[in-house]
Amino acid sequence: MSELKLDPYFGEYGGMYVPQILMPALKQLETAFVEAQQDPEFLTEFHDLLKNYAGRPTALTLTRNLSPNPKVKIYLKREDLLHGGAHKTNQVLGQALLAKRMGKKEIIAETGAGQHGVATALACALLGLKCKVYMGAKDVARQSPNVFRMRLMGAEVIPVTSGSATLKDACNEAMRDWSGSYDRAHYLLGTAAGPHPFPTIVREFQRMIGAETKAQMLEKEGRLPDAVIACVGGGSNAIGMFADFIDEPSVKLIGVEPAGKGIDTPMHGAPLKHGKTGIFFGMKAPLMQDAHGQIEESYSISAGLDFPSVGPQHAYLNATGRATYESATDDEALEAFQLLARSEGIIPALESAHALAYALRLAKDATEEQIIVVNLSGRGDKDIFTVSDILDGKASA
């Protein structure tokens, strides 16, 4: 570990729990990242892409009708307005540029609902990189519009039939491919989890979310918000929002995990509050496990939060008490999804609706004037059929 330039741990969490064959690839990636962060040319190109291709800075919108309490202002950080429809475009552009700088010709990625796959495909099309996306066969069947989008942009989508044929199996196949091809390929991981240096790279390529929010807040209100709230699956949109506020003790950092059918049922995805520390996906982190230490399937109405572990920096922020992690059920997220659409004319991603649901709960109970910022991490186009089917089912029940 002495050869590393950055600390691979956040407290006891993180690390590089990978086969020896991948250590040179991770060390090479860390070196390239550190050098790129000090290279004005790289940073200029990254910021130019964010501004002129992706559409940054994104708006900070004060909701007009959403808040249930006149004392509480609810602002939305509008990552849903970003090209590609979600926060994922930020760090994908950063990693793809980094891969190009390293001389890689090919990108390997995994995807569940297809959002990360679509973001990766658009970055590869833009930068002239070959793109291979591993996707569980079940997800390929469920997410045909995103599969078509990826293929339309030139990506090769590879259905994975092993195991449960879902995201974790796609991750395994992508990692296996990378272990034999890292001389020419970069594995573009989709969240702030996995082995070092991925959690740090993803945070740094997402931190403009919080940096912009801070500047916009000071301009609009002349002060910082009382709380910033974001949903947490692997944790990339949340760490992007939190990073610039960690050293601002007056600002509460609140992450919202998916409570699914209820925290007291096996049908949830809240490892931070209800998991045990273990080794998974190349890192030491809280993990949903059964009594025998086997990984339990996570569950959420939103595919993007359906992850049995969480990024190591979130585990550390939780352990130290700097951030608080709450949860919202499927039903609460569905209610918030519909409420935002009806009250503000904005359809959020189901993932973001979890953060919104908790913000509404917090606002309702407030007795003093407060300003809350919710990271609206993505738009809800991808979720309209899921929500429509659920609401139709409830109506006919």
UniProtKB/Swiss-Prot annotation:
Task: Please provide, in alphabetical order, the Gene Ontology terms of the cellular component aspect for this entry.
Answer: cytoplasm
Q: Does the keyword Cell membrane apply?
A: no
Q: PANTHER family annotated for this entry?
A: TRYPTOPHAN SYNTHASE, TRYPTOPHAN SYNTHASE-RELATED
Family (UniProt): Belongs to the TrpB family.
Q: In which pathway does it act?
A: Amino-acid biosynthesis; L-tryptophan biosynthesis; L-tryptophan from chorismate: step 5/5
A single Pfam family it belongs to is PALP
User: In UniProt terms, what function does this protein have?
Assistant: The beta subunit is responsible for the synthesis of L-tryptophan from indole and L-serine.
The record's EC number reads 4.2.1.20
Identify a single GO molecular function assigned to this protein. tryptophan synthase activity
Q: Which SUPFAM superfamilies match?
A: Tryptophan synthase beta subunit-like PLP-dependent enzymes
Report what the protein is called: Tryptophan synthase beta chain
Q: Relate the assembly described in the record.
A: Tetramer of two alpha and two beta chains.
Under catalytic activity, the entry for this protein gives: (1S,2R)-1-C-(indol-3-yl)glycerol 3-phosphate + L-serine = D-glyceraldehyde 3-phosphate + L-tryptophan + H2O
Q: Which residues carry this modification: N6-(pyridoxal phosphate)lysine?
A: 88
Q: Which InterPro entries match?
A: Trp_synth_b_CS, Trp_synth_beta, Trp_synth_beta/beta-like, TrpB-like_PALP, TrpB-like_PALP_sf
Q: Which cofactor does it need?
A: pyridoxal 5'-phosphate
Family annotation (CDD domains): Trp-synth_B
> Which keywords label this protein?
Amino-acid biosynthesis, Aromatic amino acid biosynthesis, Lyase, Pyridoxal phosphate, Tryptophan biosynthesis
